[in-house]
């Protein structure tokens, strides 16, 4: 049974300061109330889906903050939990993200590669920048997008200020991340590094089918795909 948080007394947990949810997020996250022999239990929808090994990566509801350290910590914790729970069963990472911090995104990426289960990635809406990189980093053969999803790759964004030596240090760090991301994208897509470097010089948008041809994903998911044996 699915209810609004205003329809059930247990939904007051979403208003708890301990959850640290933005006000807009707490107002629209649905509650799932389950009946069992031991009574009622209420879950926010994301916790309930986590029981089915589904993780969502996106900006907070009502904002487009994207991937930051707090988001990365949450995703990493969920991946580690599911790895400990069942190391053989696939994990599904749904991505609708404008991107964000490179270092935070790499924390998620390294964890995806570290854990034992296959990580199936699926883009719905938008996977841009680091979101597209994580989409491509799913288990080969299990990287997907919905038909109207958009995928965008580009080089890391950054800026520096201060003394000349500080600017030089930051510039070297940006170039390191650019080179590393391009190498990994080349590895995941099968594209030559020269093409990756050229395509990521500016925002490079693709449809789901174009992303499949490029090698960022393996299949475009349709209703027929889901119904096929």
Curated annotation (Swiss-Prot):
Encoding gene (name): clpP1
Task performed by this protein: Cleaves peptides in various proteins in a process that requires ATP hydrolysis. Has a chymotrypsin-like activity. Plays a major role in the degradation of misfolded proteins.
Cross-referenced PROSITE patterns: CLP_PROTEASE_HIS (PS00382), CLP_PROTEASE_SER (PS00381)
Protein name: ATP-dependent Clp protease proteolytic subunit 1
Catalytic activity: Hydrolysis of proteins to small peptides in the presence of ATP and magnesium. alpha-casein is the usual test substrate. In the absence of ATP, only oligopeptides shorter than five residues are hydrolyzed (such as succinyl-Leu-Tyr-|-NHMec, and Leu-Tyr-Leu-|-Tyr-Trp, in which cleavage of the -Tyr-|-Leu- and -Tyr-|-Trp bonds also occurs)
Record note on quaternary structure: Fourteen ClpP subunits assemble into 2 heptameric rings which stack back to back to give a disk-like structure with a central cavity, resembling the structure of eukaryotic proteasomes.
Main localisation: cytoplasm
Family note: Belongs to the peptidase S14 family.
GO molecular function: ATP-dependent peptidase activity; ATPase binding; serine-type endopeptidase activity
């Amino acid at each position: 049974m699915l209810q609004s948080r205003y329809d059930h007394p247990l939904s007051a947990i979403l208003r708890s300061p301990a959850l640290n949810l933005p006000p807009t997020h707490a107002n629209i996250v649905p509650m799932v109330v389950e009946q069992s022999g031991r009574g009622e239990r209420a879950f926010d929808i994301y916790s309930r889906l986590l029981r089915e090994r589904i993780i969502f990566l996106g900006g907070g509801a009502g904002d487009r903050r994207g991937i930051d350290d707090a988001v990365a910590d949450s995703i990493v914790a969920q991946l580690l939990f599911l790895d400990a729970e069942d190391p053989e069963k696939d994990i599904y990472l749904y991505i609708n993200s404008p991107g964000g911090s490179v270092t935070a995104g790499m924390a998620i990426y390294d964890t995806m590669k570290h854990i034992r289960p296959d990580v199936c990635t699926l883009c719905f809406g938008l996977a841009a920048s680091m979101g597209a990189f994580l989409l491509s980093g799913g288990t080969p053969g299990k990287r997907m997008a919905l038909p109207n999803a958009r995928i965008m790759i580009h080089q890391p964004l950054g800026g520096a200020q201060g003394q000349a030596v500080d600017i030089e240090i930051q510039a070297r760090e940006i170039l390191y991340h650019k080179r590393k991301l391009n190498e990994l994208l080349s590895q995941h897509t099968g594209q030559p590094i020269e093409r990756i470097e050229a395509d990521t010089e500016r925002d490079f948008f693709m449809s789901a089918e174009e992303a499949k041809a490029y090698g960022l994903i393996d299949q475009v998911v349709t209703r027929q795909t889901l119904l096929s044996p």
